[in-house]
Curated annotation (Swiss-Prot):
GO biological process, alphabetically ordered: mitochondrial cytochrome c oxidase assembly; translation
Range of the transit peptide: 1-24
GO MF term (any one): structural constituent of ribosome
Record has Transit peptide as a keyword: yes
Keywords on record: Mitochondrion, Ribonucleoprotein, Ribosomal protein, Transit peptide
Bias (Basic and acidic residues) ranges: 35-48
Annotated PANTHER family: LARGE RIBOSOMAL SUBUNIT PROTEIN BL27M, RIBOSOMAL PROTEIN L27
Name by which UniProt lists this protein: Large ribosomal subunit protein bL27m
NCBIfam families cross-referenced by the UniProt entry: L27 (TIGR00062)
């Protein structure tokens, strides 16, 4: 063996070790070789009992495994320790929607029981509690910054809506008195205009006529029952609403007018279809005839029916199978369109009667 090989082997133990110590998050406790490995854990069990007061972060239960599950306002740690998320009172309870599980929760009020109803909103404090009644009242009246900055605009728009409602009530009262000839005293007219205003609001929200009238009547009855000084006006309300329903109807543009029965609507619709059947608009006179005929359509037809008829008889542009001219002239319109099939620009010459706006 050569000298250099012997020197190299002699220096190998002197080299620094490549082993690096790794620190872990937990430390295993030291124990004797003969100690029992299955001995019971120490310092486990409930730390707070039923009805006991707890603060945020206080430990309620130490356990190995989920013997108890976290309920309302209770959190669970990685070692299954249950702790309070809100200040309150400890409750041990069972949840019928989770059979076989025992829960620990924190009630925010001393007389509050858990669990609350399954579909009821949760009672939460978000980690904050105002012990002073004056501070709590101030906090309730406080507005978010965005709302505070827009407060003037919000109040202004609310006042504008209130003024618009009063104006509509005045218009309804004028129509009932002057156009429909309903003889109502002051109290009955107030009830009638309020009822019609609510019916109009429901119609704008998408309800049909029957549902809109039912909802308006139901709302007024409930509010009248909850107001002791107005309970005596219940008979007057029913009588007024019956007379108003028999004398009024709303158009599809939400305009108030005389009552139109279902028979009248069907007869008007059939007469309109008979009058316009097979009509092809070629002149301005024919166009004006259709416009005049559809003027009262909003009173007899629903909005969808009126739109369907207008699209059928008042088409802005006729299909290209009609009113196509052979050569350009004074009464024609030239249209240039790119043809993606041929890659060229096609020239289409159409008569002016093909366009409704040019008649």
């Amino acid at each position: 063996m050569s000298f250099w090989k012997v020197a190299t082997l002699w220096q190998m133990p002197l080299r620094p070790s490549i082993l690096v110590q790794v620190r872990t998050a937990t430390k295993r406790a030291a124990g004797s070789r003969t100690s029992m490995k299955d001995s019971a854990g120490r310092r486990l069990g409930p730390k707070k009992t039923e009805g006991q007061r707890v603060e945020v972060g206080q430990i309620i239960m130490r356990q190995r495994g989920t013997r108890f599950y976290p309920g309302e306002n209770v959190g669970i740690g990685k070692d299954h320790t249950l702790f309070a998320l809100e200040p309150g009172w400890v409750r041990y309870y069972l949840d019928p929607f989770h059979t076989g599980r025992k829960f620990v929760g924190v009630a925010l009020y001393q007389d509050m029981r858990l669990p609350i109803e399954h579909f009821a909103p949760r009672v939460r404090r978000f980690g904050r509690q105002l012990l002073s009644g004056k501070e709590a009242e101030t906090e309730e009246q406080a507005l978010p910054r965005s709302v505070f900055l827009a407060k003037e605009k919000i109040l202004e728009r609310a006042q504008q809506r209130a003024d618009a409602r009063e104006q509509r009530r005045a218009e309804f009262g004028h129509i009932l008195r002057e156009e429909l000839g309903l003889a109502l005293d002051q109290d009955a007219e107030q009830l009638a205009t309020e009822y019609l205003l609510r019916v109009q609001t429901n119609l704008k929200s998408g309800f049909n006529s029957a549902d809109a009238r039912f909802n308006a009547m139901y709302h007024m009855e409930v509010r009248m029952r909850n107001t002791p000084e107005k309970v005596g006006q219940m008979d007057l309300l029913k009588k007024t609403v019956a007379s108003v329903d028999a004398a009024t109807s709303f158009s599809n543009k939400f305009e108030l007018g005389r009552h139109i029965s279902e028979g009248e609507r069907v007869a008007w619709r059939e007469a309109l279809h008979k009058d316009l059947a097979g009509l092809v608009i070629r002149t301005a006179e024919e166009k004006q005839r259709v416009v005049e005929r559809l003027k009262e359509a909003s009173k007899y037809l629903s909005l969808s029916e009126e739109i369907h008829l207008r699209r059928k008889f008042l088409k802005p542009v006729k299909p290209e199978t009609e009113a196509v001219a052979e050569a350009a002239g004074k009464g024609t319109v030239t249209i240039k369109r790119f043809n993606y099939g041929t890659g060229k620009v096609d020239t289409i010459i159409r008569e002016k009667k093909a366009f409704l706006a040019k008649l």
